[in-house]
Amino acid sequence: MGGTLAWTLLLPLLLRESDSLEPSCTVSSADVDWNAEFSATCLNFSGLSLSLPHNQSLRASNVILLDLSGNGLRELPVTFFAHLQKLEVLNVLRNPLSRVDGALAARCDLDLQADCNCALESWHDIRRDNCSGQKPLLCWDTTSSQHNLSAFLEVSCAPGLASATIGAVVVSGCLLLGLAIAGPVLAWRLWRCRVARSRELNKPWAAQDGPKPGLGLQPRYGSRSAPKPQVAVPSCPSTPDYENMFVGQPAAEHQWDEQGAHPSEDNDFYINYKDIDLASQPVYCNLQSLGQAPMDEEEYVIPGH
């Protein structure tokens, strides 16, 4: 009974003493003044969406544990940690880091707690080359499980092609694809032209001047007579194009005499004329015979020329 009572009295003292071994973390507000000086040994800036300054160092010379988790940081500027000589634990979990400065990795006494990320490859290489007798480096996955950093990098971050090489491969693939598409099209068009040309050459053509079948063309015939000297034509008295014109049936013969010379039967023309009332009326007239122009040339033209 006395032993139980003694343990009951000593347990709170032991717990209080064990808690004093861990540094008490000071939780900062969202509005952090980087010009202020922090005297605490543990600073908690977790989840404040902070942006670390690149041109000045954190004024916390006594800090041992610095928690920067959950701030969306993509890099850790080496200037920010320049005066943190006592820093032993740096927590940058839940930050999408893309680069870790080599000078920070060269601090062999610094324990980095970070997500498993290929950006830690430089940290791993510098530690391996400069820090001997170190424990295996660890990283954390999304379920907060620990993994060996070397094993993670070997499996998930195998050396790949350089950006220029990848670009060249992509361009070459596009060119090959274009040639693969254009090649058959050009070959098909050349084949069609060759077949059409061979068909034209195999057709039996007639004589050079003869008509070519299928084209609907006719040969050109022409004959031109030598220019004839102009012969003076005796002038004849001008006569009207008509002498008599009547509407309806012609009257008696004496009516022709009253108008002038008797009409010649060879020069008579008969025209049916319809008046406004659409009644047919015969029209008689006498026209002087017109001479035909001499046919100086005969020419037969091929259609299309």
From Swiss-Prot:
Residues 204-229 are annotated as: Disordered. Residues 1-20 form the signal peptide. It is found in: Membrane; Cytoplasm. Gene3D superfamilies: Ribonuclease Inhibitor. The chain crosses the membrane at residues 166-186. Residues 21-165 are extracellular. It is a single-pass type I membrane protein. Expressed in plasmacytoid dendritic cells (PDC), monocyte-derived dendritic cells (MDDC), granulocytes, monocytes, B-lymphocytes, peripheral blood leukocytes, spleen, bone marrow, and, to a lesser extent, lymph nodes, fetal liver, and appendix but not in thymus. Plays a role in the inhibition of RLR-mediated type I interferon signaling pathway by targeting RIGI for autophagic degradation. Interacts specifically with ISG15-associated RIGI to promote interaction between RIGI and the autophagic cargo receptor p62/SQSTM1 to mediate RIGI degradation via selective autophagy. Also plays a role in the inhibition of NF-kappa-B signaling pathway and inflammatory response by promoting the degradation of p65/RELA. This is Leucine-rich repeat-containing protein 25.
